[in-house]
Curated annotation (Swiss-Prot):
<dbReference type="InterPro" id="IPR028082">
    <property type="entry name" value="Peripla_BP_I"/>
</dbReference>
<comment type="similarity">
    <text>Belongs to the bacterial solute-binding protein 2 family.</text>
</comment>
<dbReference type="Pfam" id="PF13407">
    <property type="entry name" value="Peripla_BP_4"/>
</dbReference>
<dbReference type="GO" id="GO:0030288">
    <property type="term" value="C:outer membrane-bounded periplasmic space"/>
</dbReference>
<keyword id="KW-0732">Signal</keyword>
<dbReference type="InterPro" id="IPR025997">
    <property type="entry name" value="SBP_2_dom"/>
</dbReference>
<dbReference type="InterPro" id="IPR050555">
    <property type="entry name" value="Bact_Solute-Bind_Prot2"/>
</dbReference>
<keyword id="KW-0574">Periplasm</keyword>
<dbReference type="GO" id="GO:0043190">
    <property type="term" value="C:ATP-binding cassette (ABC) transporter complex"/>
</dbReference>
<dbReference type="InterPro" id="IPR030159">
    <property type="entry name" value="LsrB"/>
</dbReference>
<protein>
    <recommendedName>
        <fullName>Autoinducer 2-binding protein LsrB</fullName>
    </recommendedName>
</protein>
<feature type="signal peptide">
    <location>
        <begin position="1"/>
        <end position="26"/>
    </location>
</feature>
<comment type="subunit">
    <text>The complex is composed of two ATP-binding proteins (LsrA), two transmembrane proteins (LsrC and LsrD) and a solute-binding protein (LsrB).</text>
</comment>
<dbReference type="GO" id="GO:0030246">
    <property type="term" value="F:carbohydrate binding"/>
</dbReference>
<comment type="function">
    <text>Part of the ABC transporter complex LsrABCD involved in autoinducer 2 (AI-2) import. Binds AI-2 and delivers it to the LsrC and LsrD permeases.</text>
</comment>
Length: 340
């Protein structure tokens, strides 16, 4: 081999390696942030997001704080922005606490979306939403009403915190529906477990001890619902109806033992997957508008809705809500079909 030919081959090899390196660096990087790590609901959402990343050949990083806090999420957001991530998808612990960090991210060209729990709409582009407050609040009340078969009843609400966006919107709608459709129901207390399993169990036991004649606990939170079920078992209370939102894998033993007759949720794996697909469209095409539809492998078709479906007044180009296609009520007959 001549020296000239050797140099030519070496140069082409170097160029090829450089091209591969550039392609690797150019791959989209998307951060998918839960309220906190270590909770099955959020882990399942992260699994869906990372599955979508593999299907789309994009790099999806799942990471969150160990406790649900604004400061913890802000630190992660800032870190991902500084590392050059192209998009951030976050389940917000506060409707406004993340806004300064998210607005700075958008100013630097990062696509910002929310999933599960929204910020103020001006602080993100799209919210991947499990259901409108009216849909989910109504679902909670209807599940309770199927078990509380009397005009006068005592009901407790129990969920994560007084500031979290999504759950407070659902509870507001649920309480309004109770006032309208079940005026004899008395809401005796509203309490919080703050996304902590131990505190949630203690709080649930406290509710059942303080209100021994309670008819229903409505717990729209992945920690609060199993805590309420466990508290009822610990206290041997089989009279109270326990409904709410959590994952089927967590709730399966309580359903099989009859402690919980039915509960609801949505396919959070699909929610994570949809979130990444929408982010990928934004990174490739720039924006979506109200009415645009997107076909997603293994999910079906989703559509961009205006912010008004969530009760917001704010509307802007490149801003809206993508609703999940359906929600699910789990019971003893169908829970075996689900694994997340």
């Amino acid at each position: 081999m001549t020296l000239h030919r050797f140099k030519k081959i070496a140069l082409l090899s170097a160029l090829g390696i450089a091209a591969i390196s550039m392609n690797v660096q150019a791959a989209e990087r998307i951060a998918f942030i839960p309220k906190l790590v270590g909770v099955g609901f959020f882990t399942s959402g992260g699994n869906g997001a990372q599955q979508a990343g593999k299907e789309l050949s994009v790099d999806v990083t799942y990471d969150g704080p160990t406790e649900p806090s604004v400061s913890g999420q802000v630190q992660l957001i800032n870190n991902f922005v500084n590392q050059g991530y192209n998009a951030i998808i976050v389940s917000a612990v506060s409707p406004d606490g993340l806004c300064p960090a998210l607005k700075r991210a958008m100013q630097r060209g990062v696509r910002v979306l929310t999933w599960d729990s929204d910020t103020k709409p001006e602080c993100r582009s799209y919210y991947i939403n499990q259901g409108t407050p009216a849909q989910l609040g109504g679902m909670l009340v209807d599940m309770a009403a199927r078990q509380v078969n009397k005009d006068k009843a005592k009901v407790a609400f129990f969920y994560s915190s007084p500031t979290v966006t999504d759950q407070n919107q659902w509870v507001k709608e649920a309480k309004a529906k109770i006032a309208k459709e079940h005026p004899g129901w008395e809401i005796v207390t509203t309490q919080f477990g703050y996304n902590d399993a131990t505190k949630s169990l203690q709080t649930a036991e406290g509710i059942l001890k303080a209100y021994s004649d309670l008819d229903a606990i409505i717990a729209p939170d992945a920690n609060a619902l199993p805590a309420a079920a466990q508290a009822a078992e610990n206290l041997k209370n089989d009279k109270v109806a326990i409904v709410g939102f959590s994952t089927p894998n967590v709730m399966r033993p309580y359903v099989e033992r009859g402690t919980v007759k039915e509960f609801g949720l949505w396919d959070v794996v699909q929610q994570g997957k949809i979130s990444v697909y929408v982010a990928d469209v934004l990174l490739k095409k720039g924006s979506m508008k109200t009415g645009d539809k997107l076909d997603i492998q293994g999910v079906g078709q989703v559509e961009v809705s205006p912010n008004s479906v969530q009760g917001y007044d704010y509307e802007a180009d490149g801003n809206g809500i993508v609703l999940l296609p359906e929600r699910v009520i789990f019971n003893k007959e169908n829970i075996g079909k689900y694994d997340f």
